């Protein structure tokens, strides 16, 4: 069963077990410290000390007590998993500005500062450890053959459908930082509010 997700990296996160049963509330409820890895579409309640690692100083950074500037996905090599579960390589298009570092390097340096040094010191070594733990991630551009059981057919609920995305042009920090995307968003909003002309 393929589900179109509204957040980048969600499929890959599920593949490596980086999800919490019960969602964000279960993961953060009562937390004294929250390490936010660029999650700008979530609201973090007051109280916890927030460390934000991200690229565009968006919503997540505005709630942070400490900001660690990381590369945007276009500024570092990466491994992504698309909706159908296909691992894909992405190559850096440019270098991160200022003091921003590649995200894996920030986590590795922080682990050493905390006396819990992670067992890899390069992207190649990290990727090797990742593939050892999750072998399917080595099969670049291949769709895993998954067995599935048909879901039971039920009478649909009487709830109404709604769009999960309110503004397609401003769905993430990179898009929200773009002047072009802001213009497209404004044009789409004006088009939606304009009266329809009779033909």
Label each residue range with its predicted role.
Residues 1-140, 192-199:
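Non-catalytic alpha/beta scaffold blocks inside enzyme catalytic domains
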Residues 127-199:
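Long, low-complexity segments enriched in small/aliphatic residues
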């Amino acid at each position: 069963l393929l589900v179109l997700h509204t957040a980048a990296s969600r499929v890959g996160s599920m593949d490596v077990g980086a999800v919490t049963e019960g969602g964000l509330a279960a993961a953060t409820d009562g937390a004294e410290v929250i390490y936010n890895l660029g999650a700008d579409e979530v609201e973090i309640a007051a109280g916890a000390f927030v460390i934000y690692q991200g690229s565009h100083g968006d919503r997540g950074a505005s709630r942070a007590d400490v900001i660690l500037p990381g590369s945007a996905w276009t500024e570092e090599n990466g491994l992504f998993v698309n909706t159908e579960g296909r691992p894909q390589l992405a190559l850096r298009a440019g270098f991160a500005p200022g003091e921003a570092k590649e995200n894996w390097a920030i986590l590795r340096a922080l682990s050493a500062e905390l006396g819990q040094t992670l067992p890899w010191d390069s992207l190649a070594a990290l990727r090797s450890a990742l593939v050892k733990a999750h072998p399917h991630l080595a099969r670049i551009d291949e769709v895993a053959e998954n067995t599935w059981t048909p879901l039971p057919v039920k009478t649909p609920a009487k709830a109404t459908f709604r769009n999960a995305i309110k503004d397609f042009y401003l769905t993430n920090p990179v898009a929200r930082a773009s002047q072009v995307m802001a213009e497209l968003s404004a044009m789409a909003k004006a088009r939606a509010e304009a009266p329809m002309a009779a033909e």
